[in-house]
Design a protein with these regions (language model features):
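Hydrophobic anchor residue at the start of the ABC signature
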Residues: 65
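Catalytic Walker B motif of ABC-type/P-loop ATPase nucleotide-binding domains
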Residues: 76-79
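Conserved ABC ATPase signature
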Residues: 10, 51-55
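Conserved ABC ATPase "signature" region
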Residues: 18, 22, 29-47
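ABC ATPase "signature
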Residues: 134-135
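Conserved catalytic motifs of ABC-family nucleotide-binding domains
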Residues: 72
Length: 159
C-alpha cells in the first residue's frame, strides 16, 4: 500500500477491489466474499457502488488498504496505513493487522505516528536514511530509560 493511492477513479470501489482481486489471483467463486470482508474492515461497505472519483481522501486511503488486504497476501507493505483515519476505525484496522500477523502474514509498516510504532512487534528507527536503532518497542524504551517510542527517537537522535 503506497502513500499515494493508485486507484481507478472512474470505477466504483467494488470494481477496483474486483479488478485487484482478480490481478492477485483470487478465485472467482471467493472474490465477492473477500471483497465484502475487506470492505467491512475499512468501513466502505456502504460506499462500494460509488465512483472512486467521488470518494474523499480518507475513503481512497481505506480503499487502498482494502486492496492490500485482498487475496491472502503473505507480506503486507503498508506506508502510513491509518493516517487520517478516525480512532475507532484505526483500532479495527489494527485488530485485523494483528489477526493477519497471527496467521503468519509478514507486515512492514512505515509511520511517523509513534503511537502506531508502539503497536508493532519490532521498531526500526530511521534518521537520514540510516537505521539508528532496532528492537521491540518495550526494549527500546527500557534501554533508553524513557516511556514512549517518541522519547526513544528524540533521545537516540541527540546522540
Amino acid at each position: 500500500m503506497a502513500q499515494s493511492d493508485a486507484l481507478y477513479e472512474m470505477l466504483t470501489g467494488y470494481e477496483n477491489l474486483e479488478f485487484f482481486g482478480k490481478m492477485k489471483g483470487v478465485p472467482s467463486d471467493k472474490l465477492k466474499k473477500e471483497i465484502e470482508y475487506v470492505a467491512e474492515i475499512v468501513d466502505l461497505t456502504d460506499d462500494l457502488k460509488k465512483l472512486v472519483s467521488k470518494y474523499s481522501g480518507g475513503m481512497k486511503r481505506r480503499l487502498s488498504l482494502a486492496i492490500a488486504l485482498i487475496g491472502s497476501p503473505e507480506l503486507l507493505i503498508l506506508d502510513e496505513p491509518t493516517v487520517g483515519i478516525d480512532p475507532s476505525l484505526r483500532k479495527n484496522i489494527w485488530k485485523e493487522l494483528f489477526k493477519q500477523r497471527d496467521n503468519g502474514v509478514g507486515i512492514l509498516v512505515t509511520t511517523h505516528v509513534m503511537d502506531e510504532a508502539e503497536l508493532t512487534d519490532k521498531v526500526g528507527l530511521l534518521l537520514n536514511g540510516d537505521i539508528i536503532d532496532f528492537d521491540t518497542p518495550q526494549q527500546l524504551k527500557v534501554k533508553n530509560n524513557v516511556k514512549t517510542i517518541e522519547e526513544v527517537f528524540l533521545k537516540v537522535e541527540e546522540n
